[in-house]
Amino acid sequence: MNTENRSPEQFDIPLFLKNLPKLPGVYRFFDEGGNVLYVGKAVNLKRRVSGYFQKNDHSPRIALMVKQVRHIETTITRSEAEALILENNFIKALSPKYNILFRDDKSYPYLMLSGHQYPQMAYYRGTLKNPNQYFGPYPNSNAVRDSIQVLQKVFMLRTCEDSVFEHRDRPCLLYQIKRCTAPCVGHISEEDYCDSVRQAATFLNGKTDELTRTLQHKMQTAAANLQFEEAARYRDQIQALGIIQSNQFIDSKNPNNPNDIDLLALAVSDGLVCVHWVSIRGGRHVGDKSFFPDTKNDPEPNGQDYAEAFVAQHYLGKSKPDIIISNFPVPDALKEALEGEHGKQMQFVTKTIGERKVWLKMAEQNAQMAITQRHLQQSNQQHRIDELAKILGMNSDGINRLECFDISHTQGEATIASCVVYDEQNIQPSQYRRYNITTAKPGDDYAAMREVLTRRYGKIQEAEANGESVKWPDVVLIDGGKGQIGVAVSVWEELGLHIPLVGIAKGPERKAGMEELILPFTGELFRLPPNSPALHLLQTVRDESHRFAITGHRKKRDKARVTSSLGDIPGVGSKRRQALLTRFGGLRGVIAASREDLEKVEGISKALAETIYNHLH
């Protein structure tokens, strides 16, 4: 591959277009500040890139983008399929402003059977590694955990971490409630446990009929040998499998249905685009999810463009099903790229009959329903913003971004400040920030608030002064009373800020719906009715800020207490403390360890093991 770069200062677009090759590749458009605007791929770079500057029939989104282009970069590839993969990598890495982006692009969760001697069944998200077995991907974490609960009931596989498994001396509660066979203490042989693992894998691969026949044979054999307790266990497994099968709308008994199928339904309505994904794994419907790309720069979105972007971003570089059923066509180049990664031929189906037609119709109905719900949600959010604007004496168009701050600690210990963001009519978790408070005295909430506000907005001011692109909030919400708001006003004066401030205090009754609002620049202190849309918006953002602060505080506090618990033991320094935590998987594992187990850790003598054990018990 070959890449061509030119600096914005000397860049001549007409000259650049004249010298472009008629080869496949990827192009990037940049604005005056060097920010990437758009990434695209082409079979013929010269024809594709030149078309942006020679045609006048662009969509509003593309037309707005072209006006801002000041610099272009290209990368030549060997084929259109290779260009498509590279384009997708650039889009994920750069998040260009005018590309179609499906923002929920985290790695999807899997159900994992580990490669341990006694395999662990676990929720997993990340890079797939040998020798573990992975089943999925699943649309969300709940779908994985539901499957784990099902498998626990039927196959009773362990879910504990290896560090816990290796140091147990008695069965845990899961054994008592018949959700685990307690391999940790030898209540099941390795051979029998691995047989259960194979059965679970067979079930997850959709071979339920084969598994049922195997269990029926084992039940009959056990009964013939007068092993009635074992026969009853197999009977219970068969009954549980029957219940699971009856709860699925996918017919896993149909031999024409491959194990892994994805259904994709596209819907477009009133400027919104939705792609509804249904995941069928092992012949079972394991979940579904609706995806909404950002269309704010595209008032007349082309559904096919968005559908193709979803397929590329959702599947390239990730696990793929054997078959994709969709209500839109997938381009040949994209099919080629997907099959090249998959290592075998895939089926792409748009014309359906029979039960597949029913499945796709259900997915389309879900996509339409999701769009309807999104419209209602947006209307509700806009109503809340309109009401807040009236209270603050602002134009509702001037309120897009709210930032809210809260302080959390336990009697001054492990103080954390949180900043949560509400933007584009929704909370934005990826933009949340936590701040470790370092200069304030323990328990001094006012000083902590001063520190976090000064750090955050002082840094934004500095970045803006250096010519960087920054986002200022339209309103800042402070979770606290007059004291905290007074601190915020002081910081505003020091930094020269004029952003509207709103304080939200619990009020004397400390009940939801009875909050007091403080507007420091008008001197107003008042309550809104419990059913006020503006109050509901402020409560939502305030509650999220409180949750984010307290979870961060607890993590910091617990980590400090673990360090303190071991650090107080004579003879245990940082290296030995880390060795103990690594060996036993955390403080609980260290506490559960016997004296003999402690001695096995490098650097821990018999005498020191005795000291550690006595200190923790």
From Swiss-Prot:
Disulphide linkage map: none
Domain GIY-YIG, residue spans: 22-100
Swiss-Prot/TrEMBL keywords: Cytoplasm, DNA damage, DNA excision, DNA repair, Excision nuclease, SOS response
Matching PROSITE patterns: GIY_YIG (PS50164), UVR (PS50151), UVRC (PS50165)
MF annotations from Gene Ontology: DNA binding; excinuclease ABC activity
GO cellular component: cytoplasm; excinuclease repair complex
GO process terms (BP): nucleotide-excision repair; SOS response
Signal peptide: none
SUPFAM superfamilies associated with the record: C-terminal UvrC-binding domain of UvrB (SSF46600), GIY-YIG endonuclease (SSF82771), RuvA domain 2-like (SSF47781)
Annotated UVR domain residues: 209-244
Matches recorded under SMART domains: GIYc (SM00465), HhH1 (SM00278)
Family membership: Belongs to the UvrC family.
Protein task: The UvrABC repair system catalyzes the recognition and processing of DNA lesions. UvrC both incises the 5' and 3' sides of the lesion. The N-terminal half is responsible for the 3' incision and the C-terminal half is responsible for the 5' incision.
Subunit structure: Interacts with UvrB in an incision complex.
Protein's name according to its UniProt entry: UvrABC system protein C
